[in-house]
Curated annotation (Swiss-Prot):
UniProt similarity note: Belongs to the universal ribosomal protein uS8 family.
Gene: rpsH
Name of a matching Pfam family: Ribosomal_S8
Function description: One of the primary rRNA binding proteins, it binds directly to 16S rRNA central domain where it helps coordinate assembly of the platform of the 30S subunit.
Protein name per UniProt: Small ribosomal subunit protein uS8
Organism the protein comes from: Exiguobacterium sp. (strain ATCC BAA-1283 / AT1b)
Length: 132
């Protein structure tokens, strides 16, 4: 069976693992998933990312992050631009998530970046997901 939206699958796997408080999770790798995982690590939503090479496409292992009393760091993930309905934002219309408490992941002409980085570089693009 062909997966129509691998990014939504990634976000759902993270959400499910986070809900049951798994320490780590694995998912099939791709370049865009790897970039999203690196953004999550850089922004402090996950502890670490490992790429595991295999004969096929490889695997990403994400180490989820929890607070001191085991509270979730990631409280929500939402796919915005979908294969059936793409959502774009101009440079001056880049959205803020929860008043700046969360991040929006954008695919721009300069690569994948957060909403803060897109505003600093004054670029717009496709709004991939919201994470808070």
């Amino acid at each position: 069976m062909v997966m129509t939206d691998p990014i939504a699958d990634m976000l759902t796997r993270i959400r499910n693992a986070n809900m049951v408080r798994h320490e780590k999770m694995e998912l099939p790798a791709s370049n865009i998933k790897r970039e999203i995982a690196e953004i999550l690590k850089r922004e402090g939503f996950i502890r670490d990312v490992e790429y595991i090479e295999d004969a096929k496409q490889g695997t990403l292992r994400l180490f989820l992050k929890y607070g001191a009393s085991n509270e979730r760091v990631i409280t929500g993930l939402k796919r915005i631009s979908k294969p059936g309905l793409r959502v774009y934002a101009k440079a001056d219309e880049v959205p803020k998530v929860l008043g700046g408490l969360g991040i929006a992941v954008l695919s721009t002409s300069k690569g994948l970046m957060t909403d803060k980085e897109a505003r600093q570089q004054q670029v717009g693009g496709e709004v991939i997901a919201y994470i808070w």
